[in-house]
Each structure stands twice: as structure tokens, then as C-alpha cells.
Amino acid sequence: MEQSIIEGVPGRYWHRLEDGRIQCDVCPRYCKLHEGQRGLCFVRARQNDQMLLTTYGRSSGFCIDPIEKKPLNHFLPGTPVLSFGTAGCNLTCKFCQNWDISKARALDRVQDKASPEAIAEAAVRSGCRSVAFTYNDPVIFLEYAIDVAQACRARGIKTVAVSAGYIAPEPRVEFFGHMDVANIDLKGFTEGFYKTLCSGKLSSVLETLEYLKHETNVWFEITTLLIPGENDSADEIEAESRWVMDRLGPDVPLHFTAFHPDWKMLDTPPTPPQTLKMARRIAIEAGLRYVYTGNIHDSVGQSTYCHGCGTTLIGRDWYDLTAWNLTADGRCGDCGVPCAGVFDAGHGYWGARRQPVRVQAVANS
């Protein structure tokens, strides 16, 4: 049992149990803690008989990315987004592509410090249209994320949650009530996959997706990392695609991205490009209008097409925009059919750059 806990701020969503433990109610794990213990996420801890968030105001680093890297293809294309994460995660994915951050167990990994107001100010001064909570799941630092979102909204900056959607019903309402945009990682489409490789439950993620679609105005897209031999069968891809079509509708963008050997799955080979292209074809045949490939060079699979006439609406080459055929109100320039998403009259010009940022320095400049 760990007795030394770093400073933190009081956390929300917990209650006392009759046996003296306290239960964290942020995610479906419902960790039950004695004094001095941390939850599985590592950043929510019991100290002095209350729940603390130990990473408030601390980050593993800030960087300006292209919005397409989140990935988000239907939200202010071409614009820069100020991205950051903290440490820890409430899933245990053996294939984690950001394991050095999400699996961090030494809080010296989060040395960059910034207040919510400083982050919002840095976004404005850097010309970013949005701030993204990414690299690790913002659900576990929801108090910090919500405060940042409120500061950003006051400055006209949108907020983006890149999340696995593994959150309990009550905090789900508050958390997404402060977000403008989300990309939800739908990691597989069987309970066996979630249990074996993530120590989680598929059903909880599907509940989040249906909540976002039917009970919020959050623009969201879905990403599935296809792992050879684990979640890449044609049957599973078809089942996922049909579920998205039936429960969420044809306009929710779906990204199939390539796995590379990492964390505890170093012996698993990278995803072949043909698997991603197969998945895209299956999803389109299921009725989805906006299906993308990622982590490979595939300009066809990364571009956006009109579902009315088939013309290219947004051409992409990696993170660079190569074509734009949308009207000021987000319609096809050829046939006038609307394209689902959040668009300006034109696109941004950030390109593929990735620029590290010292938030306090920028905010104080």
C-alpha cells in the first residue's frame, strides 16, 4: 500500500462505503480505496479521507498539432490545435501507442505546469482554434479538463476530448457538457477483446457513443486501431460498421488506423495497408458516408467525398489539405448536398507541422 501521495486537488464523484473504503465513481472500474491507495488510473488517490486528483495543473507536455492528427477530419479542417495530456489511464491496453505517458507511474513525467487560464491564453496567442485533451484519457483528470474547457470557452476557443469513452453515467453528463468535440477510441467490437487486452467493457463505451449522439450537441468521430489477429476480421469490422450505422447514423466519421508494435505487443506485426482499405470498403458498404484510413499513406482513404455526387470535398495527403470544395455553409460545391461536420467558410493552413510549446512563456509574452 502506498502511503506517500503528492499534492492534489479535491476530486469529484466518489462516496464512502460501509467497510471504510471510498469508491471512485468516475469510470466503470469503481475503484475502492483504503487510505493512501491510488486507483488503477494512478492519478486519483485517497489521502486524508478524501479523493484527490494528483495531476491538476500538470502536463506531460504541450504541442501544436494539425487537427487532423487527433484524428478529426470534419472539425475546422487545416487548423492548429493546442494539445496536451497528463499521465495515467483507466484502461490497461496492451497495445497502447502512447504508453510512455498513459502508463507513467512516476509523476516527474508531468513537469509542465499551466493553469486553465494560461492554456486558454496560449491557445489564443498561438492562433489555435481549439485545445485538445489527448495523449492520455482526459476522463481521469476531468476536474482539470473541465476548468480548462471553461477558460477556453470564455476566450472563444473550442475544446476537444480524445477519449476511450470509458466513463460512468453521472460524470459523463458533466464532462461532455463542457466539450465541443470528441474523438472516441472504439478499440474493438467484442467484450472478449476489451476484457483481455484492455481490462474494460465494450458496453460502457457503446453507451458513451449513444449518449453523445442522442443527448448532446458534441461533434464526434470514432477511431478503431486495427490489430492483426485481434480485431481485424471482416466479420468484426462489419459488425462494428453496422452498429455505427444503425445506432449512430451514416454521418459519424469512422477512422480505421494502423497498429505498430508497442508496449506489451512488440511481437504483433504492423497492420497491413490492405487491411485498412478492406475495413474502409466494408464500412462504406454498410452505409457509412465518411470512412478513413490512418497511420498509412493513402490519399484516397484520407480524403472526404460528397455522398451525393461523389466529388472530392476535402483532399488530404497525410495532414496536408490538397483540395477544398465546400461552400461557406458546408455544402458540396458541385451539387449542394451538405457535408456533416463543423466548418468555416474556408480551411486552415497549418499543414503537417508539430510545434512544441511552453505554455507559460507564450501566455506571459
Where are these regions (language model features)?
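Flexible, acidic/Gly-rich N-terminal and inter-domain linker regions that tether
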Residues: 1-79
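Short, cysteine/histidine-rich loop/knuckle motifs that typically chelate Zn2+
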Residues: 26, 40-43, 88-91, 95, ...
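Conserved Radical SAM active-site core
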Residues: 46-181, 350-358
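A generic "binding-loop/recognition-motif" signal
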Residues: 37, 89, 190
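Conserved AdoMet/S-adenosylmethionine-binding subsite of the radical SAM
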Residues: 113-274, 279
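Auxiliary Fe-S-binding modules of radical SAM enzymes
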Residues: 1-35, 229-365
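Iron-sulfur (Fe-S) cluster-binding segments and ferredoxin-like electron-carrier domains
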Residues: 30-54, 98-108, 315-319, 339-346
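Generic structural "secondary-structure junction" signal
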Residues: 24, 33, 42-43, 54-58, ...
